[in-house]
Structures are given as C-alpha cells and as structure tokens.
Amino acid sequence: MDTLCARWARLEPHVTVVGPQDDLPRPAALLFHGCGGLRGHLPRYAEVARARGWRAYIVDSYAPRGWSRQFAMATVCTGLLLRGWERAGDVLAAIDGVSRRSDVDVSTLLLGGWSHGGWGIMEALSADRDRPGALGLADAATVPLEGVQATFLAYPYVGVAALNRMRPWRHCPKTLAMIAARDHLTTVRNAERVLAMARQCGAEVETWVADGTHSFDEPMTAPPMRFDDALSRDALNRFGHLLDDVAPAAPVHRRRRAD
C-alpha cells in the first residue's frame, strides 16, 4: 500500500505543468483525465488556466503504472481496474504533492476531472479518510482539503459502478458540473440527482446540461461519442469563468502548509 509521498513520487515525473514562468505562489488547477487517458482537450483547459495567472497540473494516472491507452480502454473503461476510489488516491497524492511547491498558493486549488477523473474526485471528497487503508493509501487522512476551493466535473462518471455516488461529500467546494444530454453512461436525471446530493452538504453547485454526447469536448473521440467544437469552446469559457470566480484578483503570497 502506498503512502502519499510514494504515490506522488510515481506520479510527479509524468505530470505536465502549464503556467506563468515565475516562482510566485499562484492558484493551481489539478486536472485528471478520463478512462481513455491523456487526450488533446486537457491542454486546452490548462492554457485557459495559464492565461488567468493559474498554474495547471495535468496528472497522468497511466504512465506511472505502465499502462497504454489500449490497455486502459480494455480494463479501466470497462471497470476491471482502477475504480474511482482507487483513482482518488492519485487525487489526494497530487493535492499533497502540489501543495508542497513554493510556487503554489495552497489556499486556492481547483480539482478538474473528466469522466473517470471526476469519479475519482468525488470519491476523494466523500471518503472516510480516517479508515485504515482508505483509497489505497496508508495516510490518506493527512491531506488537508481546506485549500480545495472548487471542482470542475466534466460529464463525471456516476453510473452503476460508482457505488458511492450518493455518499455525502465531506468537503464541499464550489462546483461546476457539465452534464451531457446524450451521455450513454448516465441519464441526465441520474447525474442531477447525484449533484443535488452535493448541494445538500453545502456545496454551491452549478450544472450545465450541454446538448452533446459524453466527451463532447474531446477531439478524435470515438462513437457513440462525438466531438462538438461549439460546445467545447463553451465549456472552456465556463471553466475560465469558474477560475475567475475562485481567484478574481492577482494571487498574493500565503503561508505554505508545513511538511
């Protein structure tokens, strides 16, 4: 079983960092791909963050495990490997690792997840991290979540395999959730029911039902999913507005969390 440091040591070499070329402590967006792995749309969101003075960290969960896209499509996308609660271990390790950087404002973090990545984020927010071995980590409870000010959930996976989808969140940040009207993995009604639960815990949740398929913002996607350029641009704009809402002013130096 990994510790947070051990998990981050595996993940960090494969993290793509996008942001201003300085050492100022800036807000950070941690971005987690879907079950198909890294695709062309996440760098577009990272550039939106960079343009607003944020740092973006695109976390690859597959390269550290030695998994190809083909392998992940056959195992993760089918639910055989790396369920959401296991992916949540990557989410916590990334929060912990990024928060130790001197060029990150640890009081202003955003978690962004696409499909499977969104599932992992929701598991991280709702888990009883005091339970021994929670989320596949020996020390999951030691990660403070107070700095997580927002989440961006792009057509998060809330289907039948997400057994904990109705489990109340224990940390309830501001949330923008994109629901695909023609998502083959969930109904709009089911997705809205899950997000209504998050509102009940005190989270400010905005939902946008986009008239597209699952992964509508991902170029080169495969049927039944279909890329929609107009909706994709709308999604990027909404992501940018969320960043503005979270950190409308230039970032200032704040005390880092002690190691």
Please name every model-derived segment.
Residues 86-170:
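Primarily recognizes the serine-hydrolase "nucleophile elbow" in alpha/beta-hydrolase
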Residues 204-259:
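C-terminal catalytic histidine-bearing segment of alpha/beta-hydrolase fold enzymes
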Residues 31-36, 156, 180-181:
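Glycine-rich His-Gly loop
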Residues 184-193:
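Conserved alpha/beta-hydrolase "acid-adjacent" motif
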Residues 181-184, 212-213:
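Acidic beta-to-alpha connecting loop that harbors the catalytic carboxylate
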Residues 4-19, 25-104, 119, 216-226, ...:
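Serine-hydrolase catalytic machinery in alpha/beta-hydrolase-like enzymes
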Residues 171, 177-179:
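Short beta-strand/loop motif that positions the catalytic acidic residue
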Residues 1-21, 111, 116-117, 122, ...:
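An N-terminal hydrophobic leader/cap segment in hydrolases
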